[in-house]
């Protein structure tokens, strides 16, 4: 039997792909929750799609755990991980601390999010976790090394 999806959580939401997914999921009858470091710019999208927004820094384990705990009444059965952290510039001039923070968001945050999602999906034997990527994952572009590393 194919189980129907009910609640989509998009972590790392912004005006591009995430906004399109919010509209798509909502138009197909799913409850939608958007999580991002800042949600002020997402208010119009939430109103349009009937979505809920929650502030969450995906590189912070406590934030991610609290995000999922706040959704336990109706846990998400679709989780999309779509954050972005970019430090642009020539490779030899990049600040190592900024690059590390970018990897914390793109890679480590993905681990944290997937771990919390799986904890809830396994008992239900149902769910989907999707990680977005970019062409940078297979071809880094000039002045975009940290972005490419995080999308690999």
What are these language model-derived features?
Residues 114-115:
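A short, exposed helix-loop element centered on a Lys and neighboring polar residues
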Residues 11, 76-84, 106, 131:
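Rossmann-fold scaffold of SDR-type NAD(P)-dependent oxidoreductases
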Residues 30-42:
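Conserved glycine-rich Rossmann-like NAD(P)H-binding loop of the short-chain dehydrogenase/reductase
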Residues 6, 75-77, 121-133:
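Active-site loop of short-chain dehydrogenase/reductase
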Residues 48-62:
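Rossmann-fold cofactor-recognition segment
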Residues 128-152:
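Catalytic loop of short-chain dehydrogenase/reductase
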Residues 14-15:
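Conserved glycine-rich cofactor-binding loop
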Residues 85, 92-111, 130:
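Catalytic Tyr-X3-Lys loop
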